[in-house]
């Protein structure tokens, strides 16, 4: 007897979430037409049980969908960044997957660093050849005016994270984020359930949209539990110049230390642990600390850091899908997509 095909089987084949596949098959929620069609074709191909759309695809289910191929001479995908992206950055595994996906479509990626002068003067990197560029993907581009300049190029454009968008006109581009709210709130809930009452945030909430969302998730959570004392001991120095020193000086002035900190990312968390150690506080014995990103360092830092894991492979696949469908269908409505994250409990929160 043949093995029954499940929604999870289809999700595994396409490397999509089970929820996305379920939406396509049950015709619920909002999905890009190309994604919905791809899922339904795969379902028919794999012999999934009868459903409303099956007759539409049975005739050509055996045929592989023709991949979209970029025109010759305009096959470069330009990656723009303001920072050197180390192997510790979540983008490392994401870009591996992204490159793999676009290579299947006979495209290549070029990397261009935006210099401080180019950022200030709103100029493209001198190394970028617009005539050969089919689309742009941006990392660490958090200057709103520069982002608007890129939008004005009228090229297919994807921001992986973005400038803070609160009270600003939307960018005319697709945006991809990791899910920033749910697991921050789960981390706060975990702390409260373990008896922590004064919970604070560390990190510059205005650095980027993801940091802003993480801060707002933290704030909503402590207000939900009626534990707002920690709001007065949030450590949020702005700017990137000598950040560890600024963070140390900020917490050194606190008259009362929090029971726990939720941090904007792992590197803020590690700087915070070091600053607390210099001030005579032990993590987790005196104060708990939670990071975000689940970087390579998080698992071998002392103490091993509780963090929120970003699925780089899924982000890479999603980024390729967003940018290539934008190139293929420029008139699509602009999309904002979030990919799942997961709380990983370790020693820095007593686990």
Label every model-predicted segment.
Residues 2, 48-124:
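Amphipathic helical "hinge" segments at domain boundaries
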Residues 139-183, 267, 293-305:
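Flexible loop/hinge segments that line or gate small-molecule binding clefts
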Residues 89-105, 183-186, 209-229, 271, ...:
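Short, solvent-exposed amphipathic alpha-helices that sit
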Residues 1-65:
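N-terminal helix-turn-helix DNA-binding module of bacterial transcription factors
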Residues 185-227, 335-350:
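An alpha-beta-alpha
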Residues 248-351:
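Flexible loop/turn connectors
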Residues 102-115, 201, 219-244:
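Short beta-strand elements in bilobed, periplasmic/extracellular small-molecule ligand-binding domains
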Residues 174-202, 241-249, 269, 310-328:
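Hydrophobic alpha-helical segments within soluble ligand-binding/sensing domains
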């Amino acid at each position: 007897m043949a093995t029954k095909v499940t929604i999870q089987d289809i999700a595994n084949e396409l490397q999509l979430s089970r929820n996305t596949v379920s939406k396509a098959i049950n015709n619920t929620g909002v999905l890009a037409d190309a994604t919905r069609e791809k899922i339904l074709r795969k379902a028919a191909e794999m012999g999934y049980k009868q459903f409303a759309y099956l007759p539409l695809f049975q005739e050509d289910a055996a045929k592989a969908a023709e991949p979209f191929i970029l025109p010759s001479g305009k096959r470069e995908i330009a990656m723009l960044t303001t920072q050197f992206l180390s192997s510790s950055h979540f983008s490392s595994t994401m870009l591996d997957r992204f490159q793999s996906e676009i290579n299947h479509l006979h495209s290549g990626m070029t990397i261009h660093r935006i210099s401080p002068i180019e950022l200030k003067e709103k100029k493209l990197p001198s190394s970028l050849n617009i005539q050969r560029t089919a689309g742009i993907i941006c990392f660490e581009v958090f200057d709103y005016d520069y982002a608007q300049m890129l939008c004005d190029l009228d090229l297919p454009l994807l921001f992986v994270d973005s400038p803070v968008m609160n009270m600003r006109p939307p960018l005319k581009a697709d945006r991809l984020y990791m899910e920033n709210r749910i697991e921050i709130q789960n981390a706060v809930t975990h702390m409260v359930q373990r008896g922590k009452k004064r919970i604070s945030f560390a990190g510059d909430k205005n650095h980027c949209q993801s940091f802003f969302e993480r801060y707002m998730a933290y704030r909503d959570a402590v207000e939900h539990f009626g534990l707002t004392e920690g709001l007065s001991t949030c450590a949020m120095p702005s700017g990137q110049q000598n950040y560890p020193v600024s963070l140390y000086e900020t917490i050194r002035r606190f008259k009362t230390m929090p029971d726990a900190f939720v941090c904007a990312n792992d590197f803020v968390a590690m700087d915070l642990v070091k600053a607390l150690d210099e001030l005579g506080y032990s993590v987790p014995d005196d104060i708990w600390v939670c990071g975000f990103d689940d970087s390579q360092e998080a698992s071998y830092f002392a103490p091993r850091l509780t963090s929120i894991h970003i699925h780089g492979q899924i982000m890479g696949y999603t980024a390729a899908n967003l940018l290539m469908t934008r190139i293929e269908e420029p008139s699509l409505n602009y999309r904002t997509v979030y990919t799942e994250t997961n709380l990983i409990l370790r020693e820095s929160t007593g686990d």
